[in-house]
Amino acid sequence: MSHPLLVDTDWLAARLAETSLRIFDCTTRLVPDPVQTYRAESGRPDWERGHVPGAAYVDLQGALSDRTSGLRFTMPSADHFAAAMSALGLGADHHAVLYSAGSNWWATRVWWMLRAFGFDRVSVLDGGWEKWTAERRPVCTALCAYPAAHFVAHPRPLLLARKDEVLAATTADDVALVNALTRRQHTGESEVHYGRPGHIPSSVNVPYLDLVDRATNTFRPAAELRAVLDHAGVLSAGRVITYCGGGIAATGVAFALALLGRDDVAVYDGSLSEWCADPSLPIEKG
C-alpha cells in the first residue's frame, strides 16, 4: 500500500479513528534573537493548548536532535532516533501523519528524518494547524500519547549531505546546491544571517516561501512547483543538495521536489550554521 506524501484536511478528518495512524504535532517556535539570529523554543505549550485529536507532540530540538553537536537540530544517530521514535509509538506497521503550526517546514523536517532512516509510511498535512483550525475541525486538549512501539532505523546516507560533500559540490557541474532562505538572505543584504552574510558559492536560491501559498500555508500546485524549480535549473541536476540556516527550511524544498518525483534529494544538515562557523569555507554575496 502506498502512502501519499501530502494529505489534506478532509483526508485526515475521515481517518482519525484508524488505529494504524500516528499523528504528530512537530511545531517549534523561532523567536528573533540579536545574538543567535533565532532562538528555538519548544512548541509543546501550543500543543497543550490544542491539537488535532489523537496527535502526540514531537520535540524536534530535544528528543530528535543530537544535543552534543553544538548546532541546533542536528540529526541524531540511528540508534538515538530509533529509540526516540519507538518511545513516541511509531513502528513499521504504522502510518505517520505530520503537521506543524507557523510553517510546514517543521513537519517536513521530521518527514525527511524519517525517510533518511528508511521509513516511508509518512505523510505531511497540507496547510498544517492553521488550515485545520481555520476550517473549524475538531481540536483536542488531552495530553495524547501512543503506546511504545518498535522502530528500526535503516539509514539512507545519500539523503544526508556533509560539509565536505557540499564543498566539493561548489565546483561540480552535475550537482545543484539550493539555498532555501529568502532572497535577501541569499544575496547577503539581510541583517538576519548565520555568522557571515551570503550564500555557499555556486548555489541557486529557491526560497521555501516561494513554494507555498502564504495565505493558506499549503503547497502550491505541482505545475507551479515545477515551474519554480525548473527555472532555477534544479530539476535537471544529477544530484540536488538543499540547505538553509539550520537544516529546516531546506527540508521543505526537498519535500517539494519529492512531490515532483525527486526522492533522492539530500539535505545539508549543518547548513549555514555549520558552514559560516568555519572561516576556511567560502561565502559569496550578490
Which residues fall in each region the model found?
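Cytosolic catalytic domains that perform sulfur/thiol-centered chemistry
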Residues: 1-286
